[in-house]
Amino acid sequence: MASGLSEIGSTKMFDGYNKRYKHFSETLGCSMTFSIYFPPSASSSHKSPVLYWLSGLTCTDENFIIKSGAQRAASTHGIALVAPDTSPRGLNVEGEADSYDFGVGAGFYLNATQEKWKNWRMYDYVVKELPKLLSENFSQLDTTKASISGHSMGGHGALTIYLRNLDKYKSVSAFAPITNPINCAWGQKAFTNYLGDNKAAWEEYDATCLISKYNNLSATILIDQGENDQFYPDQLLPSKFEEACKKVNAPLLLRLHPGYDHSYYFIATFIEDHISHHAQALEL
């Protein structure tokens, strides 16, 4: 393994293994952890495609692995699950831990342009550094066959990263994503601090803005949204994204679910549909 990449945890599940790793990120300038579920079929002679999962505010790389139950379907389909952390950690930037929705645990999957937050480059970490690290160190993974998914802030990350990198990912899905961050409080706070006042820069990290430019999609976008989600009306705004998709005939399946909230109970209920969605796009 590359210098500085070390395994820090391993548990068997559905005949595969959850493994956790630590490494020093050149992109972020700090030590980072990430988790991988290796399905039982994964080997150097039978490489597994990769589904990246981007988590939401306050989360680490462990939330999805521990709570979602995605390993059952991933084991069946032969998909590796890769879950990075949600921000740099341990940099001790003044104010980084003052609120749950900004700084530590709230990287918003962008490349910050403001000097104070210059290490917050989760976009480059997810799109460039992490795939390279995986391809160099895990012969049982096929990083050229990849899809991406996420929840809330991570759903925002999955949608924007997918739309800006249609050559790198076969499909995208999201649970309760922040689809129009330039028009919600979470997004406005994060973008103002990370990106400054340049609204054109904001739009590069807004799925509702991006779909008008990047819509030559080979796979339907799948979004699940709980109707009892406390953040649904004011922060997530999926109807705005739906309108933007309709304008350019972008294929979107937006499913609204009565009674479900913003939690991992909701994710666990429908995660199998998402794994199947990606398995189809990855031709498994």
From Swiss-Prot:
GO molecular function, a single term: S-formylglutathione hydrolase activity
Annotated residues for binding of substrate: 63, 67
Keyword terms, alphabetized: Acetylation, Hydrolase, Serine esterase
Known regulation of activity: Activity toward p-nitrophenyl acetate inhibited by N-ethylmaleimide, 10-(fluoroethoxyphosphinyl)-N-(biotinamidopentyl)decanamide (FP-biotin), iodoacetamide, CuCl(2) and ZnSO(4), but not by phenylmethylsulfonyl fluoride, EDTA, Mg(2+), Mn(2+), Ca(2+) or paraoxon, an organo-phosphate inhibitor of serine hydrolases.
InterPro entries: AB_hydrolase_fold, Esterase-like, S-formylglutathione_hydrol
Residues annotated with N-acetylalanine modification: 2
Gene3D superfamilies: alpha/beta hydrolase (3.40.50.1820)
Intrachain S-S bonds: none
GO terms for cellular component: apoplast; cytosol
Superkingdom of this protein's organism: Eukaryota
pH-activity note: Optimum pH is 7.6-8 for carboxyesterase activity.
Remaining remarks: The conserved Cys-59, implicated in catalysis in cysteine hydrolases, lies in close proximity to the serine hydrolase triad, serving a gate-keeping function in regulating access to the active site via disulfide formation with glutathione.
Similarity field: Belongs to the esterase D family.
Subunit details: Homodimer.
The protein, known as: S-formylglutathione hydrolase
Organism: Arabidopsis thaliana (Mouse-ear cress)
